[in-house]
């Protein structure tokens, strides 16, 4: 008699799925030989297979638990990846506008480059013209260099003359200082002389005023009469007052008079007598 096949499950090596193991069934054919002890041998084999199945079931349970944990972790990663995909989609939308702006900028740059091409050609012509002008200036620079050398020699000669002039100027400065001192002393003397002149002028004008005042005095010439006279006189801003007294003898042979004049500069006086002899 034949025994039915026995199905067992065995753990298969990871086939590339993250942290997930595969389990597949395996068929074990029992010993179907009809010989003494054959059934017994088949039962023993079944018992052995049962134990193996229990062991495999325990291992499968551990693998299932591990797979459950891994699936949970993968779920979190899938959610994170989904958010990253959404963020990327938004960033791609933003970049689309920037790309359009960049495309416009590139087109504008192309147009500007086209305009600059003409300017570059004009600059190239200007550079060529500058080279020609530089060539002409080279000769002028050589001429100027010779002129500078000549000027340097002339300056050296002038330096000697300037030094000589500086010595002369220093000597003149010393002489000028001496002359200034002499002129200052002379000025002081002139000032003193001017003061004396002013004083003499004032006194002279005062004397003339006194004389004018004295000349204005008039006395009584009658015999035996004593008379008093007053007068005033002036000369170039100076004014004087005068007074006098006179006497004529009874026989009219003698006349006497005394007078005095005064102003701010001083006092003048006079006295006189006259006699008749026949």
From Swiss-Prot:
A GO term from the CC aspect: cell surface
UniProt name for this protein: Autotransporter adhesin BtaF
InterPro entries linked: Pilin-like, YadA_C
Free-text comment about domains: The signal peptide, cleaved at the inner membrane, guides the autotransporter protein to the periplasmic space. Then, insertion of the C-terminal translocator domain in the outer membrane forms a hydrophilic pore for the translocation of the passenger domain to the bacterial cell surface.
Main location: other
The protein's assembly and partners: Homotrimer.
Localization per record: Cell surface; Cell outer membrane
Effect of disrupting the coding gene: Deletion mutant shows a significant decrease in the attachment to an abiotic surface and in the ability to bind collagen, hyaluronic acid and fetuin. Deletion leads to decreased adhesion to host cells, but it does not affect later stages of cellular infection. Splenic infection is significantly reduced in mice.
Region (Surface exposed passenger domain): 30-182
Region described as Outer membrane translocation of the passenger domain: 186-224
UniProt lineage: Bacteria, Pseudomonadati, Pseudomonadota, Alphaproteobacteria, Hyphomicrobiales
Record family assignment: Belongs to the autotransporter-2 (AT-2) (TC 1.B.40) family.
